[in-house]
């Protein structure tokens, strides 16, 4: 069992790394790509910032951690109209998250993970505002 403080620290580190490498994954519509990008029945597909594809069972949508992950994805990249769902996290973090969900993490670990995800979302929004301010100050001088 991991210590919750260590888990929070690890999640923050992964989120900071993911924030450095954020990008949007474009959806290719070729005949060869449609078979590989289509989700299996009963699954939904999420792409990470490092272009790794994950297929999750629909039952994961009832998990509060995945709900928070999808909210952050919506805030970061918007709702996809014809393309894939893109996660603001990298594949290492999602693999770790999958292992925690499969092992049925206890309530304390889930709460700590949700708090770290939420705090990283707030800190990334604050850093964007600081970047905007510094850009505006550069333009004034």
Swiss-Prot record:
Give one Pfam family, short name only. Auxin_inducible
Report one GO cellular component.
plasma membrane
Protein's GO biological process: auxin-activated signaling pathway
The record's InterPro entries line, in alphabetical order, gives: SAUR_fam (IPR003676)
Query: How does it sit in the bilayer?
Result: Peripheral membrane protein
On the tree of life, the source organism's domain of life is Eukaryota
Question: Where does it live in the cell?
Answer: Cell membrane
**Record keywords:** Auxin signaling pathway, Cell membrane, Developmental protein, Growth regulation, Membrane
Q: What biological function has been recorded for the protein in this entry?
A: May promote auxin-stimulated organ elongation, such as hypocotyls, stamen filaments and petals.
Q: Which family does it belong to?
A: Belongs to the ARG7 family.
What is this protein's name?
Answer: Auxin-responsive protein SAUR64
Q: Which organism is it from?
A: Arabidopsis thaliana
């Amino acid at each position: 069992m991991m210590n919750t403080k260590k888990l929070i620290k690890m999640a923050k580190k992964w989120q900071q790394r993911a924030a450095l490498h954020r990008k949007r994954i474009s959806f290719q519509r070729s005949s060869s790509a449609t078979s590989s990008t289509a989700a299996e029945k009963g699954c939904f597909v999420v792409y990470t910032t490092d272009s790794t594809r994950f297929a999750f069972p629909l039952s994961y949508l009832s998990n509060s951690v995945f709900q928070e992950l999808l909210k952050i994805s919506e805030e970061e990249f918007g709702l996809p109209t014809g393309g894939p769902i893109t996660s603001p996290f990298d594949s290492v973090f999602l693999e770790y998250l999958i292992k925690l969900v499969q092992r049925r993490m206890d309530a304390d670990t889930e709460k700590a993970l949700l708090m770290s995800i939420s705090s990283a979302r707030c800190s990334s929004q604050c850093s964007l505002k600081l970047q905007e301010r510094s850009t505006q100050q550069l333009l004034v001088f």
